[in-house]
Design a protein with these regions (language model features):
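Short, compositionally biased segments
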Residues: 215-224, 229-232, 243, 250
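Conserved active-site "lid/cap" helical segment
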Residues: 39-84, 130, 137
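Short linear motifs in low-complexity or flexible loops
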Residues: 231, 240, 246-247, 252-256, ...
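Short glycine-aspartate micro-motif
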Residues: 5-7, 85-89, 144, 204-208
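Short beta-strand-loop/turn "lid" adjacent to the catalytic site in phosphate-handling enzymes
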Residues: 73-123, 144, 151-159
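Phosphate-binding/catalytic loop of phosphoryl-transfer enzymes
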Residues: 124-125, 131-218, 223
Length: 263
């Protein structure tokens, strides 16, 4: 029996999934769930063996959606009992300063991913929920979190640090984190073969272009900055992370950030 990994990407109102052959890396089956929790019929799509199966019905939450996904495997193939699933991988946008590499899904790591939703409010919550649901549906299969931000974990301080009060930055874990790291890691790993040059010493500028887009030089997204004047580069999400009220924002932006005027 082939060994496979079921990859889950849980969004705020959607789920994408793919069953991947562990040895060849080939996608065997895939699909998506859309419009979760919306006041209209949701949409399911499951593809296997060249055939596409679709269904529309209300989808109240991620648990309902994932239960239906597992039902599609048994109804349209490959059957779960024959699929050889040895692990379930969950893509997570933000691992913060906690996760430098993939981590086993446990009660502790689920709670940590939820806590990091302050840095990725649209992503981490649904991703943690997807892992919780899949643990309950496939309790005997190991579940793994894979973090987009891990690819950028070792950024040098000069690339990851803001011109921001250090106390505020440390308290609220504000730094440049990077996004789409799994995509950047894959692209940068195959480029040497494509161009016929050794990976060591090969300089790359990597672009991820999808529903979101980013570039990895050091990188250019996720707690990244818009150009400002008085305070230098300031990224608007830092305001939401700190939940500052307007007077505090004005003080921070005008007096506490960036280079200070002297003399």
């Amino acid at each position: 029996m082939a060994k496979t990994v079921l990859v889950i990407n849980s969004g705020s109102s959607s789920i994408k999934y793919q069953l991947v052959d562990l040895e060849s890396g080939e996608g065997l089956a895939s699909g998506l769930v859309e419009k979760i929790g919306e006041p209209v019929d949701g949409h399911y799509k499951h593809e296997y063996n060249g055939e596409k199966h679709e269904l529309e019905e209300p989808i109240h939450d991620h648990e309902q959606g994932l239960k239906r996904v597992l039902g599609f495997f048994d109804e349209f193939g490959p059957k779960l009992a024959d699929a050889g699933i040895v692990a379930v991988g969950h893509r997570v946008v933000q691992g913060g300063s906690i996760f430098p590499k993939p981590a086993l899904v446990t009660n502790k790591t689920i709670n940590q991913v939820k806590d990091l939703a302050v840095l990725a409010p649209l992503h981490n919550g649904p991703e943690a929920k997807g892992a919780e649901v899949m643990r309950s549906l496939l309790p005997d299969v190991p579940q793994i979190f894979v973090f987009d931000s891990s690819f950028f974990f070792q950024l040098p301080k000069v690339a990851s640090t803001y011109a921001l009060n250090k106390e505020i930055a440390d308290q609220y874990h504000i730094r440049r984190y990077g996004a789409h790291g799994t995509s950047h890691e894959y692209i940068s790993s195959v480029v040497p073969d494509v161009v016929g040059k050794p990976a060591e010493g090969l300089k790359q500028i990597v672009l991820h272009i999808g529903n979101g887009a980013s570039q990895a030089v050091d990188h250019a997204v996720f707690l990244q900055c818009d150009d400002g004047g008085n305070a230098g580069g300031v990224f608007q999400h830092k305001v939401f992370v700190k939940r500052l009220q307007a007077p505090h924002v004005r003080h921070a932006h005008g007096q506490a950030l960036g280079l200070k005027q002297t003399g």
